[in-house]
């Protein structure tokens, strides 16, 4: 308790921490907690299980509590932040809501971007939330552009998310990254009219006065939101006319100029050039902290930690809420309406509640992105930037928004890029460094070569069910097609997985598969072996963990594995990310991950005190054709086995190349074993040692000692000689050097 109190942690939280048997803070906690309590933005990296969740949860709980306490007692901070700007008093393009290479003329209407590789966009200073409106855009050159409408939630890259509607010079309309043919192309000297009927939920365009017809039906979740005139440019110049000047092609059918919109229908932009300041009034659905996790399991895990840490925090009590998909939203909405202080959730459901106005971001003091590299790899970059843009940068009591980013590694380019965009002079706390394999882990590769191992030809139908990629191909033995070898690899990997379990008499292991379908097929194969979820204690008892399983089933399966009720957890990278499962003796990589960092995440989970962990990777010697869904359904009901470049949903997966990249990343050569998967064992100090990495480095103490032994002996002799000489000096017969 004293150790945490010395860092400034309040006594109530320190008491709860002590009950969890946390006598001393971990390294990441000792570094990060004081920084966050001090009000700074923090980027932290540490291994899973290092206390990273506590490192951000403890200070977040404390500051949220102190904020609520101050409000309860009527205390107010000194706000020196100026808000508002004269730029909002007229219709023009907003210099505070634009891309970095987007230029606006002194009149606020002439716009230009000369960036030839990237799109840069902008929105107007004002928007409208009711009525029928029109504005014109004149093209001054032959560059590329899209014009239209968007909400403040939208990306400045107009038409690439569900909050914006664009029409481009190539004759395409765009919404939510869906580009469809519409109208006709336009270029220099053309004038585009942009129409919106908010009451009836329609958007349309005209070219030089010619009506191009209906372009979009506005979705229900956007009908009550203010929309702003928007554009995005690539090496182009435009000029806007909101109605202060005469239109070249005046609108008909009741549409009026934006500049003539009544005051009751006009909404000023929140992007004013100075920091947004949150409302002083407390709203029940406006939390003080928002913690975003990449998976439901991790969100539940973090929420449980928050509950433990705040156990003794009272008067006022903190209210936390879990917001995740896959469960009924009704209960979550009820709790939101009753009031909430800390929200922990996953991006999908949080995005839904924000877009429908159910979750208010006006009071957020903390934005925490846990496992940020996982969030970015799942494609949530736009979501993160969007919600960060909606959160006021300064609270009503004058405190700045704090952003905390946690990641398994801070050396990812995407994480660095994100931090530069949304964080304010962050402090880096990197206790992980570059990826390396723990010395308690022995990892080996088993080559899967169907040209050498002909077992797959003799199995008939008694093999694992494959993913269906080759259902329409001729994969019968006797040919020499790439498809035949690919199917053979899938079959052999099922056999090698079973062989590895039997050979090493595995009592517990995590088995990583590439896709959810692969996980299901492996589980079914274990059932064929007599195991499965219902066979407790069987050699092949197993449970499955991936996002297609119901949340309750996932939670139950994870608990069963942790309690050793089943031997094997079959899962995907996404499902397993960040989950606190450690000390597992074995990991099997049925397929190598396509991101080399994930390889270290996977194998780092193995190892016990009594023995080293063993990670076995099955690596195909030939290319394997696998699913890579780019379709809107993300694989549900998809049977398009054509390659991605041909409009399909498959790719050729090159594990040999991936292995080379992993070895280069780790600067070591991974040992290879034969298909019988017999891994050489060495005896040392009564413990089983599965082997050593070929790279030189830590752990090779014996050789190091042998090298130093002669020098140590020489030092010992010199020390003895020096001490003997000193003693003799004190007792010389003539007593010239008498000691005192």
From Swiss-Prot:
EC id? 3.6.4.13
Q: Which GO terms describe its biological process?
A: double-strand break repair; mRNA processing; tRNA splicing, via endonucleolytic cleavage and ligation
Keywords tagged on the record: Activator, ATP-binding, Cytoplasm, DNA-binding, Exonuclease, Helicase, Hydrolase, Mitochondrion, mRNA processing, Nuclease, Nucleotide-binding, Nucleus, RNA-binding, Transcription, Transcription regulation, tRNA processing
Q: SUPFAM superfamilies in the record, alphabetically? A: Concanavalin A-like lectins/glucanases (SSF49899), P-loop containing nucleoside triphosphate hydrolases (SSF52540)
Keyword ATP-binding among UniProt keywords: yes
Give the GO molecular function terms: ATP binding; ATP hydrolysis activity; chromatin binding; DNA binding; DNA/RNA helicase activity; exonuclease activity; nuclease activity; poly(A) binding
Query: Which Pfam families does its entry note?
Result: DEAD, Helicase_C, SPRY
Instruction: Give the InterPro entries listed for this entry.
Output: B30.2/SPRY (IPR001870), B30.2/SPRY_sf (IPR043136), ConA-like_dom_sf (IPR013320), DEAD/DEAH_box_helicase_dom (IPR011545), Helicase_ATP-bd (IPR014001), Helicase_C-like (IPR001650), P-loop_NTPase (IPR027417), RNA_helicase_DEAD_Q_motif (IPR014014)
DEAD box, short sequence motif: residues: 370-373
Annotated Helicase C-terminal domain ranges read: 493-681
The chemistry this enzyme catalyses reads:
ATP + H2O = ADP + phosphate + H(+)
Q: Where is the B30.2/SPRY domain?
A: 70-247
Residue ranges of the region described as Interaction with dsRNA: 1-448
Record Gene3D superfamilies: 2.60.120.920, P-loop containing nucleotide triphosphate hydrolases (3.40.50.300)
Detail which positions bind ATP: 46-53
Name the enzyme group at the top EC level: hydrolase
Annotated Helicase ATP-binding domain residues = 2-428
Record localization = Nucleus; Cytoplasm; Cytoplasmic granule; Cytoplasm, Cytosol
Q: What PANTHER family does the database record attribute to this sequence?
A: RNA HELICASE (PTHR24031)
Protein family (similarity comment): Belongs to the DEAD box helicase family. DDX1 subfamily.
Q: What is known of its domains?
A: The helicase domain is involved in the stimulation of RELA transcriptional activity.
Q: Main role?
A: Acts as an ATP-dependent RNA helicase, able to unwind both RNA-RNA and RNA-DNA duplexes. Possesses 5' single-stranded RNA overhang nuclease activity. Acts as a positive regulator of transcription. May be involved in 3'-end cleavage and polyadenylation of pre-mRNAs. Binds DNA and RNA. Component of the tRNA-splicing ligase complex required to facilitate the enzymatic turnover of catalytic subunit rtcb. Binds (via helicase ATP-binding domain) on both short and long poly(I:C) dsRNA.
**The protein, known as:** ATP-dependent RNA helicase DDX1
Native species = Xenopus tropicalis
Q: Organism classification, top ranks?
A: Eukaryota, Metazoa, Chordata, Craniata, Vertebrata
Q: What is the name of the gene encoding this protein?
A: ddx1
């Amino acid at each position: 308790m004293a150790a945490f109190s010395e860092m400034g942690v309040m006594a109530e939280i320190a008491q709860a921490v002590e009950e969890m048997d946390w006598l001393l803070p971990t390294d990441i906690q000792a570094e990060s907690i004081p920084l966050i309590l001090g009000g700074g933005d923090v980027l932290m990296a540490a291994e899973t299980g290092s206390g990273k969740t506590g490192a951000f949860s403890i200070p977040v709980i404390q500051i949220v509590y102190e904020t609520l306490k101050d409000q309860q007692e009527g205390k107010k901070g000194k706000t020196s932040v100026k808000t508002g700007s004269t730029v909002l008093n007229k219709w023009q393009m907003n210099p505070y809501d634009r891309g970095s290479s987007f230029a606006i003329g002194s009149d606020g209407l002439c716009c230009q971007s000369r960036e030839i590789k990237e799109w840069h966009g902008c929105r107007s200073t004002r928007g409208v939330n009711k009525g029928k409106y029109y504005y014109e855009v004149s093209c001054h050159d032959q560059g590329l552009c899209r014009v239209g409408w968007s909400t403040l939630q939208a990306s400045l890259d107009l038409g690439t998310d569900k909050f914006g509607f664009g029409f481009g010079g190539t004759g395409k309309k765009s919404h939510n990254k869906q580009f469809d043919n519409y109208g006709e192309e336009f270029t220099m000297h053309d004038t585009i009219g942009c129409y919106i009927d908010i009451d009836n939920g329609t958007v349309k365009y005209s070219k030089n006065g010619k009506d191009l017809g209906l372009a979009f039906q506005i979705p229900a979740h956007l009908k009550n939101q203010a929309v702003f005139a928007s554009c995005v440019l690539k090496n182009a110049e435009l000029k806007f006319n909101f109605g202060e000047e005469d239109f070249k092609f005046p609108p008909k059918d009741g549409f009026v100029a934006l500049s003539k919109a009544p005051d009751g229908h006009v909404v000023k932009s929140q992007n004013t050039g100075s920091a947004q300041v949150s409302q002083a009034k407390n709203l029940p659905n406006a939390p003080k902290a928002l913690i975003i996790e990449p998976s439901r399991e991790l969100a539940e895990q973090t929420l449980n930690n928050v509950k433990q840490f705040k156990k003794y925090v009272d008067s006022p009590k903190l209210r936390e809420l879990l917001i995740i998909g896959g469960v009924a939203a009704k209960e979550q909405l009820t709790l939101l309406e009753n009031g909430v202080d800390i929200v922990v959730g996953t991006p999908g459901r949080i995005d839904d509640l924000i877009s429908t106005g159910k979750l208010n971001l006006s009071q957020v003091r903390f934005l925490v992105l846990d496992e940020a590299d996982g969030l970015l790899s799942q494609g949530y970059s736009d979501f993160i930037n969007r919600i960060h843009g909606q959160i006021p940068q300064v609270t009503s009591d004058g405190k700045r928004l704090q952003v905390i980013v946690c990641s398994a590694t801070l050396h990812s380019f995407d994480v660095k890029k994100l931090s530069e965009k949304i964080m304010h002079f962050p402090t880096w706390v990197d206790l992980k460094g570059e990826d390396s394999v723990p010395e308690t882990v022995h990892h080996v590769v088993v080559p899967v070569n169907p040209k050498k191992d002909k077992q797959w030809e003799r199995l008939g139908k008694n093999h694992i069910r494959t993913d269906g990629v080759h259902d329409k191909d001729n994969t019968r033995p006797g040919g020499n097609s790439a498809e035949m070898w690919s199917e053979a690899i899938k079959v052999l990997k099922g056999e090698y997985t079973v062989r590895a379990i039997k050979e090493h008499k595995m009592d517990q292991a995590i088995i990583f598969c590439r896709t959810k379908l692969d996980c299901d097929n492996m589980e079914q194969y274990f059932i064929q072996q007599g195991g499965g979820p219902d066979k407790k204690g069987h050699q092949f008892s197993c449970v499955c963990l991936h996002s297609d399983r119901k949340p309750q089933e996932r939670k139950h399966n994870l608990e069963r594995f942790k309690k050793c009720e089943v031997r094997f957890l079959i899962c995907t990278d996404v499902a397993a990310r960040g989950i606190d499962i450690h000390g597992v003796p074995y990991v099997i990589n049925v397929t190598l991950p396509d991101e080399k960092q994930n390889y270290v995440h996977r194998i780092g989970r193995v190892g016990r005190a009594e023995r080293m962990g063993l990670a076995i990777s099955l690596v195909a010697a030939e290319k394997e054709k696998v699913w890579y869904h780019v379709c809107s359904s993300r694989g549900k009901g998809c049977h398009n086995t054509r390659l991605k470049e041909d409009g399909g949903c498959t790719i050729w997966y090159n594990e040999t190349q991936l292995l080379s990249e992993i070895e280069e990343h780790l600067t070591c050569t991974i040992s290879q074993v034969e298909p019988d998967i017999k891994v050489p064992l060495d005896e040392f100090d009564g413990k089983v040692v599965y082997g050593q990495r070929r790279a030189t480095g830590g752990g090779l103490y014996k050789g190091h000692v042998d090298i130093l032994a002669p020098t140590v002996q020489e030092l010992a002799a010199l020390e003895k000689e020096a001490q003997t000489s000193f003693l003799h000096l004190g007792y010389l017969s003539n007593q010239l050097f008498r000691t005192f």
